[in-house]
Amino acid sequence: AFVNEDEVMFMNNFADSLKWSGPDKKTNDDFDSKEDLANAINSYMKIYDDHALKNTTFYGGSVYSTDKPNSDPNTGIRVYGDWYHKHTETGKEVSHKWMALVWFNEAGKIYEFRDFFDVNGFLKQHTQ
């Protein structure tokens, strides 16, 4: 949905009670709402085109690295990948490494979402 810039479909993956900690947050207990994420996604889609998430890796069973087996269904997943985009106005191609911690509720909706990437490094590409 994100790659196709379908904001409605993308946001349908998130619970109304979503707690989102974006890459601009300084601590893991600083959250924004689903509405804040929707506004951020809307802005992002206006600024960039040709989105692609490549080299993805998913780790289930725990959001934190562990060698112990875990059967708790509420432990979430870790997602890693490389995002590629094209700046709408300049046509400049930009990319960044990305990582997310994602937890799902019983309805299959994401109720907590923490995503991480180097915002300053990403923005610096626009001037190089």
PLM features: residue spans?
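A short hydrophobic beta-strand element
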Residues: 73-83
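Short, surface-exposed coil-to-beta transition loops
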Residues: 93-99
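A solvent-exposed, acidic/Ser-Thr-rich amphipathic alpha-helical stretch
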Residues: 8-75
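Low-complexity, intrinsically disordered terminal/linker segments enriched in charged
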Residues: 109-128
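Short, solvent-exposed coil/turn segments at beta-strand boundaries
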Residues: 102-110
